[in-house]
């Protein structure tokens, strides 16, 4: 009866309601248990013109929607199966990342993430109808991909031999099938996933796992020799699980910045890294190099070609080259350790950008050449060395006033690195010209990439002629030139691959 008690009781009720509301907001949408979803990920699927684990499609689908390979602790297979079997739950989940402010205005969402239900207004009209431009196109693509998953048309998991030409084809449960196909097989293709849906509604997880295993047995029997080997299948699943690029890149960049500041402080005072610090930094480089070696080897084994065929792969290869060069040079030039961390970290960050993240695909014939691999490797080694020279220039400019001796030492080291860098770049251009002649019947065509590669070679050849060009004997001028010259590398790689046209642009 006390007023104080009544107020306390009212506060308790309100707090309880608030907690329950927060819990409801935090409740995960329905999906399959992790073990059952893993069975779904173990199926084969025809995706991106190749046969791969359905786990790969699930990962790409999740990254496409929310920008991460996991969502609120759920695995990619759980996200995919959630959309497939619990559409009504997931259409209200704010997980679709909308980068463009213009697209967010069209969808009338306040944050960076939208619900599928936000794509239609109250009278069920599609909000992006008639919207033009790349931002609206990206949002529209995500809407359509969700539709393809929810209807099952993207899940081409049923192989069959076409009676008309005896070729192996892959179908989803909603695809049309040849009339000559045996009735039992056609019935299995059309009804298997519907039966899985019925078992999901009953929450018969053992039954769901059993049917998924039967589908996998059917795939192996019908696919026969066309299926990837068990080792390659497991290698791709391991590759999908071990993608730790973002935390590795962040750790490398933070270590590189801290190491760079510490190195500048030590060079001003005339001190070197302590043995313990040097050991930890070298161990980090070695660990990162081993991880990238494993990831490149897995990607190359899964794809069936050297992993240097597009922007994503070449930037990861450049990170690997950087770490290797750091290990080779760091014992003689300890201050290169922070540069190695920075270059490798930035390369990994760039590889994860939207434009530089194509899926694992089969190579078009013109790219399936050992000459291309040699060409790309030589150029990436050159770019890694030139990046070291650029960071050496930054350090030289910073230290010029307080430690002129250190700036002069950095100039000598940078000039030493320029020789193999220019050699590798020239050799890479030469091998690329031979590859162009084999592929297209001409050595040189003044393509934008070829022009800018030649410009980069000529720019970096200038500091090597300090005997004829006395300006390059001055440490400060040399360092500023090396910083500015790196712009030609950026234009050659990023400007041509992503902005300019030409025959090289598709490779980015």
Question: Where are the model-predicted features located?
Answer:
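Soluble extramembrane regions of membrane proteins in the secretory/endomembrane system
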Residues: 23-238
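Extramembranous, membrane-proximal N-terminal regions and early juxtamembrane loops
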Residues: 218-237, 259, 263-271, 275, ...
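Bacterial N-terminal signal peptides
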Residues: 8-17
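Generic amphipathic alpha-helical segments used as scaffolds and interaction surfaces in large
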Residues: 180-183, 198-202, 206, 271, ...
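Positively charged n-region of N-terminal signal peptides that target proteins for export
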Residues: 2, 6-7
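Individual transmembrane alpha-helix segments
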Residues: 233-249
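Hydrophobic cores of alpha-helical transmembrane segments in multi-pass integral membrane proteins
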Residues: 35, 39-42, 47-53, 57-59, ...
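Short, charged, amphipathic alpha-helical segments
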Residues: 206-214, 275-281, 411
């Amino acid at each position: 009866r006390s007023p104080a008690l009544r107020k306390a009781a009212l506060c308790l009720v309100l707090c309880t309601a608030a907690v329950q509301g927060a819990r409801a907001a935090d409740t995960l949408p329905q999906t399959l248990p992790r073990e059952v979803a893993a069975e779904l990920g173990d199926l084969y699927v025809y995706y991106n013109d190749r046969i791969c684990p359905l786990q790969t499609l699930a990962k790409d689908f999740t990254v496409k929607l929310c920008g991460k390979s996991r969502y609120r602790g759920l695995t990619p297979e759980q996200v995919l199966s959630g959309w497939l079997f619990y559409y009504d739950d997931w259409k209200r989940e704010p997980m679709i990342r909308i980068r463009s402010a213009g697209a967010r205005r069209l969808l009338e969402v306040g944050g960076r993430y939208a619900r599928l239900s936000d794509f239609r207004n109250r009278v069920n009209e599609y909000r992006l109808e008639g919207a033009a431009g790349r931002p609206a196109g990206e949002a529209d693509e995500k809407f359509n991909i969700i539709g393809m998953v929810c209807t099952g048309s993207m899940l081409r998991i049923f192989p069959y031999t076409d009676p008309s030409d005896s070729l192996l084809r892959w179908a989803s449960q909603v695809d049309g099938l040849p009339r000559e196909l045996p009735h039992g097989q056609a019935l299995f293709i059309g009804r298997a996933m519907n039966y899985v849906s019925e078992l999901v509604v009953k929450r018969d997880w053992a039954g769901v796992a059993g049917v998924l295993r039967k589908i996998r047995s059917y795939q192996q029997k019908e696919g026969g020799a066309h299926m990837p080997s068990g080792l390659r299948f497991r290698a791709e699943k391991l590759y999908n699980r071990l993608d730790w690029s973002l935390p590795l890149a962040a750790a490398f960049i933070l270590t590189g910045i801290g190491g760079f500041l510490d190195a500048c402080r030590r060079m001003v005072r005339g001190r070197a890294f302590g043995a313990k610090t040097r050991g930890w930094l070298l161990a980090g480089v070695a660990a990162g190099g081993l991880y990238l070696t494993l990831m490149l080897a897995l990607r190359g084994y899964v794809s069936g070609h050297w992993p240097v065929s597009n922007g994503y792969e070449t930037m990861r290869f450049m990170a690997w080259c950087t770490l290797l060069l750091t290990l080779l040079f760091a014992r003689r030039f300890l201050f290169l350790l922070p540069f190695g961390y920075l270059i490798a970290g930035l390369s990994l960050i760039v590889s994860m950008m939207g434009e530089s993240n194509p899926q694992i695909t089969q190579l078009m014939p013109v790219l399936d050449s050992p000459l291309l691999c040699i060409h790309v490797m030589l150029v990436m080694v050159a770019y890694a060395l030139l990046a070291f020279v650029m960071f050496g220039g930054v350090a030289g400019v910073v230290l010029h006033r307080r430690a002129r001796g250190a700036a002069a030492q950095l100039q000598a080291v940078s000039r030493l690195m320029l020789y193999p860098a220019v050699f590798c770049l020239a050799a890479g251009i030469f091998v690329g010209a031979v590859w162009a002649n084999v592929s297209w019947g001409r050595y040189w065509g003044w393509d934008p990439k070829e022009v800018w590669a030649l410009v980069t070679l000529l720019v970096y050849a200038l500091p090597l002629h300090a005997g004829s060009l006395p300006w390059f004997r001055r440490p400060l001028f040399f360092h500023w030139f090396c910083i500015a010259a790196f712009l030609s590398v950026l234009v050659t790689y990023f400007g041509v691959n992503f902005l300019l046209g030409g025959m090289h642009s598709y490779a980015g």
